Amino acid sequence: RFAPSPTGYLHLGHVVNAIVTWGVARAHGGAVWLRIEDHDRQRCRPHFEAALLDDLAWLGFVPDVGLTPIIRQSDRTQVYETALASLRAATRVYACDCSRARIGGERYDGRCRTRGLTEGSGTGLRVRLDEGDETFDDLRLGPQRQRPSEQCGDVLIRDRDGQWTYQFAVTVDDIEDRKSTRLNSSH
């Protein structure tokens, strides 16, 4: 899948990602889906999406025929609600009123995990992460191991304004769409 956010115009990084995505898909007999990651309602603009689609078409990158041409996160609220309901049923979700300033870094310390806050105005929702390792195979680097609970702590899945977070939306989308390979750049 190629999944840009329409928060600005297509740039060289997008083009490189598109070339690699289409190339890897073709080399492995896969298909390319276009997913517009427009979860950030404050920064996403229709004219950026239109320009992005025009630029991709001009470059010759179009979603594969027969697939849903464009998937938009803004059209998938019910999918996210269903995923949230599953997490709630497993008692993995809790309300959190911590601001970015209070957290102060990349790792959330779990302050609200046991506070018993009520969901509503002024709170976001976090998912309780399991302790331990997560493993995966990186096509370039080989087998990898990470500890998300130690690296970032419990992840925010819906913010105080009721918007789905990037981390939650892309994870649910990839699971829902049965994506097996994700291409990201490394810095």
Name each model-derived stretch.
Residues 95-182:
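Active-site cores that bind ATP or allylic diphosphates and position pyrophosphate for catalysis
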Residues 1-105, 175:
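N-terminal Rossmann-like or analogous alpha/beta NTP/dinucleotide-binding catalytic cores
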Residues 183-187:
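Positively charged, low-complexity/disordered segments
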